Regions:
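Small/aliphatic-rich secondary-structure junction motif
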Residues: 5-55
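Gly/Ser-rich helix-loop-strand patches that form or flank binding pockets
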Residues: 1-4, 100-144
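A short acidic, glycine-rich active-site loop
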Residues: 58-69
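Amphipathic, non-transmembrane alpha-helical secondary structure
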Residues: 23-30, 34, 72, 95, ...
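Short glycine/serine/threonine/alanine-rich loop segments
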Residues: 38-39, 83, 107, 138
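Structural beta-alpha unit
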Residues: 1-7, 76-110
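Generic structural signal for helix capping and beta-alpha/helix-loop junctions
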Residues: 49-50, 95, 119
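Conserved beta-strand positions in the Rossmann-like core of class I SAM-dependent methyltransferases
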Residues: 41, 86, 141
C-alpha cells in the first residue's frame, strides 16, 4: 500500500448504496475530508444477478439505478460541503469491485457503512464491509 505520507489522509474512497449506514458513511467521510483537505472518490457497485432470466435483468437494471442515485446524492452532499469528489459506477460483486478500485487509486482511507441495502437493491451488503476490511491493506473505517 502506498500512502501520501505517514498518517496523512489525502484521498478517501467511500462506498455508497443509499442505505442509512451508507449515508452516514458519506457524511463522516465528508467531515474528515473537509477537516484534512482530502478529496473523495465515491464508488457504487451494481450487483449483477448470476441467473440470466427476465426477472434478473429487471433486478440488474434496478440495482444500477439505485447505484446511480446513491452516487448522485453523494456528489450533491460533497458539493454542498465544498469537498472535491469524483464518482465511479462498477458492476459485479461489491466487495471485489471496491477492493479492485482501491488498488487502482490507492486511497489513504476507505469508508463504508456497516450494512447496506438488501435484495435486488443491494449494491453493498453488510458482509461487504467485513470482506473489504479483510481483503485490503488500506485503512478501513466502517460506519454504523
Amino acid at each position: 500500500m502506498e500512502s501520501s505520507g505517514e498518517g496523512e489522509i489525502r484521498r478517501i474512497l467511500v462506498a455508497v448504496d443509499g442505505s442509512p449506514q451508507s449515508i452516514r458513511a458519506v457524511r463522516m467521510a465528508l467531515n474528515i475530508a473537509k477537516a484534512v483537505g482530502a478529496s473523495i472518490d465515491f464508488i457504487s457497485v451494481s450487483e449483477l444477478s448470476d441467473i440470466p432470466t427476465l426477472m434478473a435483468e429487471a433486478q440488474n437494471e434496478q440495482s444500477e439505478e439505485y447505484a446511480r442515485l446513491a452516487l448522485g446524492m453523494s456528489m450533491k452532499l460533497a458539493l454542498a460541503k465544498g469537498v472535491k469528489a469524483e464518482v465511479v459506477l462498477r458492476k459485479g460483486h461489491p466487495a471485489g469491485q471496491i477492493v479492485r478500485y482501491a488498488d487502482e487509486i490507492k486511497p489513504d482511507l476507505i469508508v463504508l457503512g456497516s450494512r447496506g441495502l438488501s435484495g435486488a437493491r443491494g449494491a453493498i451488503l453488510g458482509s461487504v464491509s467485513t470482506a473489504v476490511s479483510r481483503s485490503t491493506g488500506y485503512a478501513v473505517l466502517i460506519v454504523k
